[in-house]
Amino acid sequence: MTEQLEARVEDVVQDIARDLDEEIYVLAPPKQNYLLLEVALSAAASLLLQAFVEGTKTVIADASADGIRVGFRRIMHSLRNRFAGALDEPNSMADDDANEARRNIASELWELRKHWTATQLESLTAKVQLDFQQALIGEGMSEGAAVSVATKLGAATTRLLAEADDTSV
């Protein structure tokens, strides 16, 4: 894995963070959602992107409808727990969590790129985007916001996977 890919993940996370809508607040535990104002949106974007990449790995592991449903339920539960954990921490610790998430994203993208063709990954990302969108709606996000967030995450993942390929040369 290269530092170049990790830097690109950081750039993409910042782009996503700039575009996040207020709807992101529904993913925080109800008693803590106001605390998202205190946590950098880049931390939220990092966690969302990591969850999306985990969704891609879930679909690879078990592409059956039940496998995907169970996998996304687990991912959304994990995402809520990570949000709760980040909200319970001082901002510096939340930033550390976000940095770790970005490193994990770069590592996972690198691994995916080593084992799958660009065409396979593009198709897979489109499938995950739809599943992720439904999972966000299931977590209480409005349909419009879920479509917007899932589309941004799908586009970011596709772009990063292409760049992971470019950095491997």
Predicted feature residues:
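Short amphipathic alpha-helical segments that predominantly mediate membrane engagement
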Residues: 1-42, 69-169
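Short hydrophobic alpha-helical membrane-entry/anchor segments
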Residues: 48-75
